[in-house]
């Protein structure tokens, strides 16, 4: 790609009107996240329609485990985004180069470490979650093959974080479009053409991740200016690493604890049988689709606020937060309502089993319909992280969301055993966490920008 096209892909975050720039930044980011989720959704849909409901349950039961193991490293990539954005706002080119080198090596090392951990703990953690015996072996096989491709997944996500820090969300989207098409074609070949099951969709996902990683590394090597990746200069710079970890580790730990609570909830879901697992696995895809609207607003908040906070443009920081929050609330509410309204239709893409669809509809009506409330703490927490405040939203989210869900499963659910009662904890935890994080944001803004 030429330097001219590279420049056009970037967004000036420090000057001019904000709404359209944030929208232009956020839309490709939302589409990129949706395409990544489509990798998993295609896996779920193909095995659900062309293999079996048990294969669908095997793939779906792995989602909380995968999130648990990768969230720490995704948090560190968020820290890299903030650090690079701050340096861009300060126009510190040497620090930008050091950060690029550091984050690239961290991605490669983390990916290899996570691959080994994931392969090793696949069976023990699924057994700990009370995964039914009739789906356990398939779930273990899927998870182990999936983690063979996890180094490529992390390299792509860290590389995309670098491009997002300079306002470029379009080129990662182009990569994911191609990788998503390849993933879909390989799924159909392996499952329908070759008669494979969960192993086929796992291999297809790993191949798609490898293509994405190779492509984004090539883009970064050809970048002009300070964000160009030069292999001969690769090393870890302690100053940049320390700052990335200060911001990224709390965010990653939040994600891990969040996932632990979801693993506990998934374990409770497993107690309702294979149909409930499969129905929940199908329904959760639509939660992810809607959640990635929030993720796009999170990414915009981190990058825009990161640069403007670094440049000490605090009035713009306040306006950026409000725009991102409103975009997330409105966009997520519309998507939540649409999917829930036609839940039978959308669930039929994943399965034709009436009992599975029944459980999926219960989840959509009890969780998905209220998901827009999560914007209150997600976008606000991202705004705080863009200003370098990572620990506070982490602590509040851990208490307001994660601990409440665990308490609910062990203290409340034994007295109200219905599947719908289990799911009520989601909107309750979002309301509590949102209230706490918004108060923290207001206190931070009074500190840096007193009226």
Residue ranges of model-derived segments:
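Transmembrane helical elements of multi-pass membrane transporters/channels
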Residues: 24-43, 145, 179, 208-212, ...
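Helix-terminus/linker motif at the lipid-water interface of multi-pass membrane proteins
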Residues: 34, 38-57, 126-133, 189-196, ...
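Small-residue hotspots at the loop-to-helix junctions and early N-terminal turns
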Residues: 51-64, 143, 202, 274-289, ...
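Residue-level signal for transmembrane alpha-helical positions in Major Facilitator Superfamily
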Residues: 23, 27, 39, 76, ...
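Short alpha-helical transmembrane segments in multi-pass integral membrane proteins
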Residues: 1-26, 84-149, 182, 193-249, ...
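Small-residue-rich hydrophobic transmembrane alpha-helices
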Residues: 56-116, 153-172, 266, 279-337, ...
